[in-house]
Amino acid sequence: LFRSGEAGQDTPLAAAASVSAPIDLAATCRNLMRPCNWLSHFMLLRQMKREALGPGAALTPAERDGIRKARTLWQFDEQFTAPRNGFADVADYYARCSAMEFLGGIRIPTLVVAAQDDPWVPCAAYLGQHWSAYESLCLLPLLPEQGGHVGFHGVGSRHPWSDRAVAGFLAFHR
């Protein structure tokens, strides 16, 4: 959504789809850090630290130290991601890189799927959008009450409902 909104008409894509995308990075980070998400938060942070510190990583000693000391995703982004990528701070990074700021720039048919019961990505950012106000009229939001985070398990099918919805949408817009 971020890249599509940023690109506008300058895209080779005929259509796009998004499932459970974190369109508000700050809210998603806060949600992931809730006690009920501690295991997912821990695993995601560990993976991010492992990748950032991996072989061949060109890091300064201060960056390595910041990554190692980060105990939350917020701290990781505050101590490493934001400064490494030229942002003033973590709030600046989250604000400027959140996809909800770019939705109005999307100029291709785009399916947006997000469950209202997603434990990681808060649906409030989706529900707070004025979808009909977007000039492009290219955005189709599907915001079911249930589905979890990329769950959308379909009854009677081994393929998740969201996969079938995305495939149908993209096939229609070929």
Segment roles from a protein language model:
Residues 2-84:
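Alpha/beta-hydrolase-fold enzymes
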Residues 10-11, 103-107, 130-136:
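Short, conserved loop/helix-junction motifs that constitute active-site signature segments
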Residues 79-102:
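Active-site nucleophile elbow and catalytic-triad environment of alpha/beta-hydrolase enzymes
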Residues 100, 116-119, 146-148:
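Acidic beta-to-alpha connecting loop that harbors the catalytic carboxylate
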Residues 106, 112-114, 118:
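Short beta-strand/loop motif that positions the catalytic acidic residue
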Residues 116, 120-140:
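Conserved loop-alpha-helix segment in the C-terminal half of the alpha/beta-hydrolase fold
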Residues 141, 147-161:
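Catalytic histidine-centered segment of alpha/beta-hydrolase-like enzymes
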Residues 165-173:
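C-terminal alpha-helix
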